From Swiss-Prot:
Enzyme class: transferase
Binding-site residues for Mg(2+), renumbered to this chain: D10, D111
PROSITE patterns per UniProt: UMUC
Coiled coil stretches, renumbered: none
Organism expressing this protein natively: Nitrosopumilus maritimus (strain SCM1)
UniProt xrefs under InterPro entries: DNA/RNA_pol_sf, DNA_pol_Y-fam_lit_finger_sf, DNA_pol_Y-fam_little_finger, DNA_polymerase-Y, DNApol_IV, IMS_HHH_1, Rev_trsase/Diguanyl_cyclase, UmuC
EC assignment: 2.7.7.7
Subunit structure: Monomer.
The protein's name in its UniProt record: DNA polymerase IV
Domain UmuC: 6-194
Length: 364
C-alpha cells in the first residue's frame, strides 16, 4: 500500500501580503490590516500584520490602539481596513492553481487548503518535494503570493509542518521522521489545543509533546474526557486517519438586482435590499452554511462602484441578523451619497458549515 502524502498549504500573512502586492511600496513598512468596529476612531482589532509589524509586537487579534502604541516609533506604519472582495479574488486564483496539482483538494479557508497528492507522487516524498516547489513557483508566478507548505503522511502533521519555516517555507516530515519532529514541540502546537488545555498540562509539569506522550490514554480520558483525551493521545503520536475531503471554495454567496429606477432614497433601496437578503438566505439554508461577513454593493448611475462590508462577532445563518446588518450598512453607505444607484447587491462570505466537525477546543 502506498504511503499517503498530504500537503497543507498556508498563505503567509495573507491579507497584509495581498496589500503589499497591490501596493509594492508597503513592503518595507509595518502593515496592519484592521477590522474596524462601528464605534468609530481606532476601535477594532488587527486581522493580520506583516512580519515587519510583528517584530514590534503588532499581531493578529490585538486591539488597533495597542498595535499603534507598539508601532509608535515607526512613523511609516500603515493601518488599512480589510478588503474582503480583493482578498477573495486573490484567494480564488491561488486555489484554482492548487487544485490543478492535486488528486483531492480540500478548501479550508481563504488562506489555506489540504491536497492529497498520493497518486501523482506515487507515495514518494522526493517527488512530493518537487511537486510542492512547482506549486509554490506557479502561485508566485501567477499571483505573486508566497505560501508555506507542510508535507507528511496526514493532515495533522502537515498542518503543524506548514507553520514550521514561515514565511515561504517548505517542511517535509516523512513517516520515519514523525516521532522526532513532534518530540520537542510545545503541546500548544497541536491544532485544537487551547490555552486552558495547555495550562492544565503545565500544572502537570508537562510542556512538550514528548512529555505528554508519556501519559496513557486512560489518564488523558480521565483528565479531558474520552473524545478529547483520545484525540490528544493519537495526536502526540502523529496519528491521524482523517481523509482529505473534496471541498472547493465557496467563498461567497450574493445576489444583485438592477433597480426599476435609479435612486438614492433609503426606503426604496431598503425594500429592494431586504428582498435580496431573503434570496441570499435561501441559498445558505440550502447549503447548510453559516456566514461571518456581510456586504452590500452599489453600481451608481455613473457606473462607478461602491461597497461596504462588516465582519460579525460570530458565524450565523440568521435571516434577522443578515437583515439588521444590511440595514446598518445601507444607512452608512448612503451618508453623503450624491450619485443615484442603478444596481444593488447583497452578499455573505467567510462561510462555514453549520453542522460538522467541531474544533477540539469546543469540548474543553
Amino acid at each position: 500500500m502506498e504511503t499517503r502524502i498530504v500537503f497543507h498549504i498556508d498563505f503567509d500573512y495573507f491579507y497584509a501580503q495581498c496589500e503589499e502586492i497591490r501596493s509594492p511600496e508597503l513592503k518595507s513598512k509595518p502593515v496592519c490590516v484592521c477590522v474596524f468596529s462601528d464605534r468609530g476612531g481606532d476601535s477594532g482589532a488587527i486581522a493580520t500584520a506583516n512580519y515587519t509589524a510583528r517584530k514590534y509586537g503588532a499581531k493578529s487579534g490585538i486591539p488597533i490602539v495597542f498595535a499603534k502604541k507598539r508601532l509608535e516609533e515607526r512613523k511609516d506604519a500603515v493601518f488599512l481596513p480589510v478588503d474582503f472582495d480583493y482578498y477573495s479574488e486573490m484567494s480564488e486564483k491561488a486555489m484554482k492553481i492548487m487544485e490543478e496539482f492535486s488528486d483531492v483538494f480540500e478548501y479550508v479557508g481563504r488562506d489555506e487548503a489540504y491536497l492529497d497528492v498520493t497518486k501523482r507522487t506515487e507515495g514518494d516524498f522526493h517527488k512530493a518535494s518537487h511537486l510542492a516547489q512547482q506549486i509554490k513557483n506557479s502561485i508566485r508566478e501567477k499571483t505573486k503570493l508566497s505560501c508555506s507548505i507542510g508535507i507528511s503522511p496526514n493532515k495533522l502533521i502537515s498542518k503543524i509542518a506548514s507553520d514550521f519555516q514561515k514565511p515561504d517555507g517548505l517542511t517535509i516530515v516523512s513517516p520515519e521522521k514523525v516521532e522526532g519532529f513532534l518530540e520537542s514541540l510545545k503541546i500548544r502546537d497541536i491544532p485544537g489545543i487551547g490555552k486552558k488545555t495547555e495550562q492544565r498540562f503545565t500544572e502537570m509539569n508537562l510542556e512538550t509533546i514528548g512529555d505528554v506522550k508519556r501519559l496513557d490514554v486512560f489518564t488523558l480520558n480521565k483528565e479531558f474526557g474520552r473524545k478529547s483525551g483520545t484525540y490528544i493521545y493519537n495526536a502526540v503520536r502523529g496519528i491521524d486517519d482523517e481523509l482529505v475531503k473534496e471541498r472547493e471554495p465557496s467563498i461567497q454567496h450574493g445576489k444583485i438586482v438592477t433597480l426599476k429606477k435609479d435612486s438614492k432614497d433609503y426606503e426604496f433601496l431598503l425594500e429592494n435590499t431586504l428582498e435580496l437578503c431573503k434570496e441570499v438566505h435561501e441559498i445558505i439554508q440550502k447549503k447548510n452554511q453559516m456566514f461571518k461577513s456581510v456586504g452590500i454593493s452599489f453600481v451608481q448611475s455613473d457606473l462607478s462602484n461602491k461597497t461596504k462590508s462588516k465582519m460579525l462577532r460570530n458565524p450565523t445563518m440568521s435571516l434577522e441578523e443578515l437583515e439588521k446588518t444590511v440595514e446598518q450598512l445601507l444607512r452608512e453607505a448612503l451618508e453623503n451619497q450624491t450619485a443615484t444607484i442603478r444596481r444593488l447587491g447583497v452578499k455573505v462570505s467567510e462561510l462555514s458549515e453549520s453542522q460538522g466537525q467541531r474544533d477540539i477546543t469546543s469540548y474543553f
